[in-house]
């Protein structure tokens, strides 16, 4: 089990920086931070995954692309850039079910694992493990990285459930870096246009989608529904 702090969207905080500077001495399970500046300053490993914005822009920012294939365009471009050092793929930008249509043997082999960021983590994990097995890949060689509104208790429960089934890692942000007595706001930053064109994140659960144009969301969903029903 490994954990990393996800601080890319957090305000400047002396407390967060202090925690980062001491965490590396506390436990071997702390592997780094997604804040590149703090990683450099505190001699930590900069670690993270793809952002939703990357998949949204690469897959939907070109009007010639069918947005239901956003994950394919994103993974194809990523692999061309990084070769065999591709890290962790993000699954839920236009739903995990659609992602798995493009997560073929090549990509499943080249990426070291996948990231959960919405929906039921246990259902998602079992679905991913089955997909690896269907492709003939041993899921114990791959990483399931969980990053959806985690605290230590949730992370421990997930780890105990998937231990022995796959490698397990966690990206824990708000709970570690903004653990005040005030309930945190549910705020995220996402791109809404690329090249003058609407783009959207759908997610695996209601309430985590992002787009300013409901007509584009409807169009994207129609494209996905057609693909899921005809391929």
Residue ranges and their predicted role:
Residues 96, 119-142, 147-231:
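Gly/Ser/Thr/Ala-enriched C-terminal appendages of enzymes
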